[in-house]
Every structure is written in C-alpha cells, then in structure tokens.
C-alpha cells in the first residue's frame, strides 16, 4: 500500500510540474530572452505578455499584443533558427525610464522571412530580467 501511495504521490508531482506554466524571467538576461521568445514560438502570446515586465504590459494591452504578434507570426511562419548575435548591459534605453537594461540581439530565420534581427530589451525587476520591448527587423 505504501509503494502505491508513494507512486501516486510521485506521479502527482510529475503531473504538477508538467502543467505548471514556464516562467520566462530568470536572473540571466540571455536565458530570460530565449525563454520568452520560446513562448511566442509556441504561440503562447497571452503568456508571453504576462511574463513581460511592468513597462511592457503598460505600453501594450494583452489583446493588442496577442493580435499583433499572431498576425506577424502567421506572415513570417515558424522559426527555423535563432542565434545570439550580441548581449549588452546598459543603464538607459530610448523612450524608457532610467534603470538596468540588457539588450539581446538575435540573428534569426523564419520560414518566410530570412536574415532577421530580433532585438529583445529586458529590464531588471526584483532581481529577474523581464522583457521590456521586442522588435524584429
């Protein structure tokens, strides 16, 4: 009986871990940016909005973010590859209040758009790097 209960308890833990939402914010900016982009790659637009910084969520509504991102990703298709091009830490970004920021630039290729630059600006919030803005060129 104990082994059955132990097995059920372990199974419950595994299930709970599997359904728990992934948190994009980490103590390392490159990891945070990549995890956040993975949410978008997996069409988890609402979750990517929720995982953004306060600055991000104030600047764009969840509905607008979901709509714009969905339309754009449908146009360019799925990500084929993405490589970190550069990472920089700065104290200010254009049109943002002074703070601690990181910019992670990626060279990316999508199904229908090649040779892209994705720029993820992150801000340090409570010791975690959260996305403040996202641009693709």
What residue ranges belong to the model's regions?
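Exposed beta-sheet edge and beta->alpha loop/turn motif
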Residues: 89-137
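Short solvent-exposed beta->alpha transition segments
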Residues: 30-32, 46-99
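Short, low-complexity N-terminal intrinsically disordered segments enriched in polar/charged residues
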Residues: 2-4, 8, 19-44
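Hydrophobic core
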Residues: 13-17
């Amino acid at each position: 009986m104990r082994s059955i209960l132990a097995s059920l308890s372990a199974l419950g833990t595994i299930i709970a871990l599997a359904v728990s939402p992934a948190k994009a914010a980490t103590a390392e900016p490159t990891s945070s940016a990549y995890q956040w982009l993975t949410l978008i790659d997996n069409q988890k637009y609402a979750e990517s909005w929720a995982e953004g910084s306060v600055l991000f969520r104030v600047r764009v509504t969840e509905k607008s973010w979901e709509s714009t991102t969905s339309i754009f990703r449908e146009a360019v298709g799925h990500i084929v590859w993405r490589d970190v091009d550069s990472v920089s830490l700065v104290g200010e970004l254009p049109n943002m209040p002074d703070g601690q920021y990181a910019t992670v630039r990626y060279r990316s290729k999508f199904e229908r758009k090649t040779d892209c630059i994705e720029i993820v600006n992150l801000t340090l919030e409570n010791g975690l790097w959260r996305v403040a803005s996202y641009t693709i060129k």
